Amino acid sequence: MSCMGAAVNIITTDGPAGRAGFTASAVCSVTDTPPTLLVCLNRGASVWPVFNENRTLCVNTLSAGQEPLSNLFGGKTPMEHRFAAARWQTGVTGCPQLEEALVSFDCRISQVVSVGTHDILFCAIEAIHRHTTPYGLVWFDRSYHALMRPAC
């Protein structure tokens, strides 16, 4: 699986169960009518109960140079320290949007399918916020790679 390159994303939520976020590369477009993404989340992850209860999330696609933030959200760092390391806006669903992301997709979880150890979260896009940063970040062969041509 390490040879499957993918965009690096920070998935965030905020709601009745609290604020949480994690780094994910298992994210992709499902359909444009209605606009839907999918996000894969391990049911054993510490953030799973928060996302499961809140039922909203924001997919923040990272830009080149945001590797430290990806590592922070991918580790065991307490949530308040993760969110303190960047600037955030609040999306229409109430989820945190990373100000310097390449793009942020503000979503409601419309369906959940369990496969093995993971839940596949189907996410209906409510709003898209495109940022001015042009260069993307991908994860390939267990390392980060900056896209040095404009991604959007």
From Swiss-Prot:
> Which residues are connected by disulfide bridges in this protein?
none
Which reactions is this enzyme annotated as catalysing?
A: FMNH2 + NAD(+) = FMN + NADH + 2 H(+)
Q: What is its EC number?
A: 1.5.1.42
Question: What Gene Ontology terms for biological process does this UniProt record contain?
Answer: nitrogen utilization; uracil catabolic process
The UniProt GO MF terms for this protein read:
FMN binding; FMN reductase (NADH) activity; FMN reductase [NAD(P)H] activity; riboflavin reductase (NADPH) activity
Does this UniProt record's set of keywords contain Oxidoreductase?
yes
- Report the domain of life of the source organism: Bacteria
* Pfam families, per the entry: Flavin_Reduct
Which Gene3D superfamilies does the protein's record reference? Electron Transport, Fmn-binding Protein, Chain A
Induction data: Up-regulated by the nitrogen regulatory protein C (NtrC also called GlnG) and repressed by RutR.
User: Which keywords appear in this protein's UniProt record, sorted alphabetically?
Assistant: Flavoprotein, FMN, NAD, Oxidoreductase
Mind telling me which InterPro entries this protein's record contains? Answer: Flavin_Rdtase-like_dom, NADH-dep_flavin_reductase, RutF, Split_barrel_FMN-bd
**Entry's NCBIfam families?**
RutF (TIGR03615)
The protein's job, in short, is: Catalyzes the reduction of FMN to FMNH2 which is used to reduce pyrimidine by RutA via the Rut pathway.
**Which family is it part of?**
Belongs to the non-flavoprotein flavin reductase family. RutF subfamily.
The record's listing under HAMAP family reads: RutF
Q: Any idea what this protein is called?
A: FMN reductase (NADH) RutF
Phylogenetic classification of the source organism: Bacteria, Pseudomonadati, Pseudomonadota, Gammaproteobacteria, Enterobacterales
**Encoding gene (name):** rutF
